[in-house]
Amino acid sequence: MKLTYQGEIPVKKNTQRISKHGGIYKPKNAADFEETIGWEWRLTRQEPVPGTFKIVSGAFYIPERKDLDGCLTSLLDALQYAGAIENDRLLRSINDLKKIPLEKGAQERLEITIEAYT
């Protein structure tokens, strides 16, 4: 499965908030990211990756201040939400994953290839 996304990538640790009534909710940018990743995946018309999986290659074009692991966690949660993977805990291997710092004002994006783990 190959996926390319262009837009803001939220960092996972900052995606849940507590309301004034004590409930937990996702901010709009995190919910929008999950929804958009789901549509991007559906548009590729690729089959879901069954069972365990590996990241063959991935590149996150993000600002220096963002953590790569937080962005990866957000992406895996979004892919699970969309049904592209069963569960993000089934990740078994990461072969090649890069963080490429952006110049100020440049657009964030990601490119990732995921395959079944054999």
Describe these PLM feature segments.
Residues 1-118:
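Acidic, proline/glycine-enriched N-terminal capping motif
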